[in-house]
Each structure stands twice: as C-alpha cells, then as structure tokens.
Amino acid sequence: MKNVLRSTVIVSLALGLVGAAAYAAPAPAAPAKGAFQRDLLGVYSDAEKKTLDLEEAVPQNKFDWRPAPGVRSIAEAYLHIAFGNYAVIKFATGKEPPAEVGFEMNPAKWDKKTKDKAEIKKILEASFAHVHNAIGAVSDADLDKTVNLFGHDMTVRATLIALSGHLNEHLGQSVAYARANKVTPPWSKDEKAHEKASMAEKKP
C-alpha cells in the first residue's frame, strides 16, 4: 500500500513539473485481458463518468475561473487530466497518443490549449478512450515489469494505479471548483433525489 501511495504522489508531482488538433472518434476498447485490468478500469470508469458529467454541468463562462493567481483554472484542470492520461500511459505501456491529438510532454503548454467547453469535452473523451485501449491490452505478465516514470522505477501495475489516483485527485479539485461557482455535481443531485424518494416511500 505504501508503494502504491508513493507512486500516486510521484505521478501527481511529476505531471505538475514536466516541462488545435482534430479529435477523431476513438475506436471501442477491446475487453481487458485480466482481472486486475478489468477491476481497475471499473473504478477508473466511475471517476471518468463523473468528470465528464461535471464538465458538462459547468457553464462556459466559468471555464477561465481560478481560485487564485498561478493556480489552474477550471479549463486547465480538465486539460491536465487529459495530459496525465496520455503521459502516464506512454510511460507505462509505450502506447503513444494518436498523432491527431498533437500531444506534447509539456503540461504548462498543454493545459492552456483551449478554454472552449465543447473542445475540452472532446479532448477528455479521446484521452479516456486511449486509457481504456491501452490498459485493456496490458497482459498479466506486463503488470510486473518495471518502467521508469519521471526518474522513478516502478511496476506497470503501480503506475496504472497511480494514473487512476491522478484522475481522482483532479476530479476532487474540479468538484471544489464547481461548488465554489455554485454548481452542484450531477451525481450529488441524483443521490439527494434518491434519498427523498426513499423517505417518501417510507412515510405511512
């Protein structure tokens, strides 16, 4: 567990420090090869859906909002998620981002690609599809191979877990940003509606 947490911290720090293309519809991902890969993608998919739902809920005029100078804006936080998806998958599996993405290993530049809500959604969707395709192709034998991620040696397994942690970290950041702008996460609304319905059913 300590190694996994350490890997997540390394990914988060490295992606913050590492010094408009057309986005074609990605091909459907093949079924994952092993139980770990399937379980990881299941957890990842939940955070992925919440990220896309939240991005959709935030109005365009809030995408350049940031909590303080020098801190990522709403748009930049979403773009940084996509950056992490492409960068970590490249190191973990060797799978390069599609050429049409125009990926650069430069988060400061990538995170400022655009402020357009619709384009950011396409960028996120393409990066999520890339993650699914890459992890789905990883064999069980590959999981224990050692890769070098920003100067740190770790297994492919730990690197992929850290990737999921990176998504959840910035989903949490995006939730805080949304609430600061009076936007309630869609799944939170659904949970409250379900609770009210359940309470109504219990009343005599």
Predicted features by range, described:
Residues 41-45, 52, 62-105, 148-204:
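Short, contiguous alpha-helical
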Residues 20-29:
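Boundary at the C-terminal end of the N-terminal hydrophobic targeting segment
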Residues 1-6:
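Positively charged n-region of N-terminal signal peptides that target proteins for export
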Residues 28-41:
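Short, low-complexity N-terminal intrinsically disordered segments enriched in polar/charged residues
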Residues 109-147, 155-169:
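Acidic/histidine-rich alpha-helical segments that form the ligand environment
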Residues 58-59:
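Membrane-proximal, proline-rich intrinsically disordered regions
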Residues 8-20:
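Bacterial N-terminal signal peptides
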